[in-house]
Amino acid sequence: MRPKNKVKTNRIVRHFRLRKKVIGNPERPRLSIYPSIKHLEAQIINDFEQKTLVGFTTKAKEFQKISGLKTGGNVAAAVLFGKFVAVKAKEKGISKVVFDRGGFLYHGRIKAFADAAREQGLSF
C-alpha cells in the first residue's frame, strides 16, 4: 500500500535520520525549528533531561508587537524571528546550540532563520 503523502513521509524519514546524529546536551541544547505554512516555531531542548528550555513562535504577541507582522510565512519574517530567538536565548544564558532543521531542506525560511540567529551571536 502506498503512503498517502509521499513528501511528508520522506520528510519524516529524513528527520529520523537527522535525529540519530543531532543530540542536545546541557552545554549545547538542540534548537529545533518547524515551519508551517503561515508561521514558524522554534524550541531549545535539552535531550538528556528531556526538557524544553525555551519555546518560541511567530504567533506570540511579543514577537508580533516587535516585528509588526501577523504571519511568519516568508523569508523576511524568518530573519526577524531568527534574531528574536537568538536574543531570547542569550537572555536565558544559552549561547551555543545544535541546529535541528527537522528534516526540512536547509533553504529559504530555514536558512534565513539560521543565518539571522548566527548574526546575533548564537553559535551552531
Residue map of PLM features:
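Ribosome large-subunit tunnel/peptidyl-transferase-proximal elements
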Residues: 2-124
